From Swiss-Prot:
Source species: Homo sapiens
Family named by the database record: Belongs to the adaptor complexes small subunit family.
Protein's name according to its UniProt entry: AP-3 complex subunit sigma-2
Major localization class: Golgi
PROSITE patterns: CLAT_ADAPTOR_S
Length: 193
């Protein structure tokens, strides 16, 4: 089972942190720091697996990582997971990010955190691998994007509110709405029309 997924840059700044086991925040920060120091001091031509038993609390935990440009992608897993399978999973996750963001970079992980988390949830949920087919993952992401566009998102909410008021066909827009003891002053909507 996957215990945690960590993505941090060359300077140790976390860009994505997802724990699938409950830890206090101080312990999570310590795990991220120690993982960064363990991974950073390894040479690029050394094996991408290392023991992480003392980090997460058991002797059967491993850290499996890949280094892409300025980012380290680290999966903390227990002994039941295949190291090569997790390396392939990291590759699938990164290539999916690359397809969704058209040449993904660190800034995409910073400014599109919600989308990155959604992509990760399509791949891994609750520490279990859900999907490894990149085309299927991208199709789900595109379906989600179409749904968001059809709903208009939050940015279109003010325009929808104004058009809803216009569609009421009131002869005159009320200036005050009284509901019991509650008195609501209606703003001048003519400036939005």
């Amino acid at each position: 089972m996957i215990q945690a997924i960590l993505v941090f840059n060359n300077h140790g700044k976390p860009r994505l942190v997802r724990f699938y086991q409950r830890f206090p925040e101080e312990i999570q920060q310590q795990i991220v720091r120690e993982t960064f120091h363990l991974v950073l001091k390894r040479d690029d031509n050394i094996c991408n697996f290392l023991e992480g038993g003392s980090l997460i609390g058991g002797s059967d935990y491993k850290l499996i990582y890949r280094h892409y440009a300025t980012l380290y992608f680290v999966f903390c897993v227990d002994s039941s997971e295949s190291e090569l399978g997790i390396l392939d999973l990291i590759q699938v996750f990164v290539e999916t990010l690359d397809k969704c963001f058209e040449n993904v970079c660190e800034l995409d992980l910073i400014f599109h955190m919600d989308k990155v988390h959604y992509i990760l949830q399509e791949v891994v949920m609750g520490g279990m691998v859900l999907e490894t087919n990149m085309n299927e993952i991208v199709a789900q992401i595109e379906a989600q994007n179409r749904l968001e566009k059809s709903e208009g998102g939050l940015s279109a909410a003010p325009a929808r509110a104004v058009s809803a008021v216009k569609n009421i066909n009131l002869p005159e827009i009320p200036r005050n709405i009284n509901i019991g003891d509650l008195n609501i002053k209606v703003p001048n909507l003519s400036q939005f029309v």
